[in-house]
Design a protein with these regions (language model features):
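Non-catalytic propeptide/linker segments at domain boundaries
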Residues: 2-90
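Histidine (H) residue identity feature
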Residues: 34, 82, 93-95, 133, ...
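Extracytoplasmic
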Residues: 75, 84-86, 114, 126, ...
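A generic local secondary-structure boundary/capping motif
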Residues: 78-81, 159, 188-189
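Short glycine-rich His-centered loop
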Residues: 87-107
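Soluble periplasmic/extracytoplasmic beta-strand elements of cell-envelope proteins
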Residues: 88-93, 170-175, 198-200
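Catalytic-core regions of hydrolytic enzymes
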Residues: 104-119, 123-186
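A short, glycine/acidic-enriched catalytic loop
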Residues: 180-200
């Protein structure tokens, strides 16, 4: 009987330790909220406020008040349907051969296509959307890398897919940004290195 009590106590302590460790890990991984901003219509109508608080404009692109119209944006209904049988989101890669500084040779999961797989699983499993993920290599023709024509090949292919799947409401051409070898587009969230995201 004493041995049984000892075993039960050990099991209980180890379970409590596991729950404590799990809670600590979850708290450490949680993203802390940013300070609250005044998001009144007047503030959102201010182009400089939007630019300074929500956007980073790359030096190779431009932005203007005409294409950052908050009032028009907020008036739109961006909600998606959650039908269980038809796709709502399409993900593809004009440049499927894009890799990262630490990608392993020949490992698809380390490429932008692998990022697409991960995004697909998040949108499907966590948010309940039906997602199509196209993995065609539009930037490889006859064994040669050709990124310039990839957009044309991808456009033709995606247009056909959209004709066959009119339920698709969002199309994402997912890329890894092309930058100089010594440039790393990362930021820090709660002390963890995190990739920056550009919506374009």
């Amino acid at each position: 009987e004493e041995e049984l009590k000892t075993n039960l106590k050990t099991d209980t302590n180890s379970k409590a330790l596991t729950e404590t460790e799990t809670t600590a890990a979850a708290q450490q991984a949680a993203v802390l909220p940013h300070p609250l901003l005044d998001l009144s219509p007047d503030r959102l109508a201010d182009y400089d406020f939007l630019l300074n608080n929500f956007y980073i404009v790359d030096e190779n692109t431009d932005a203007s008040a005409a294409n950052l119209n908050a009032a028009q944006f907020l008036a739109e209904d961006f909600s998606l349907s959650h039908g269980p049988l038809e796709p709502q989101i399409l993900i593809y890669h004009s440049h499927s051969q894009e890799t990262f500084a630490d990608s392993r040779e020949g490992e698809e999961s380390d490429t932008i296509v692998g990022v697409g797989d991960y995004l697909t699983s998040l949108l499907t499993e966590k948010y309940g959307y039906q997602v199509m993920h196209i993995k065609e290599a539009f930037d490889m023709m006859s064994g040669e890398l050709d990124r310039n024509k990839a957009y044309d090949y991808a456009c033709d292919y995606v247009e056909k897919v959209l004709e066959e799947n009119p339920s698709v409401e969002v199309v994402i051409d997912l890329h890894r940004d092309g930058v100089d070898e010594d440039r790393r587009l990362v930021t820090e969230i709660n002390g963890k290195t995190t990739a920056q995201i550009l919506f374009y």
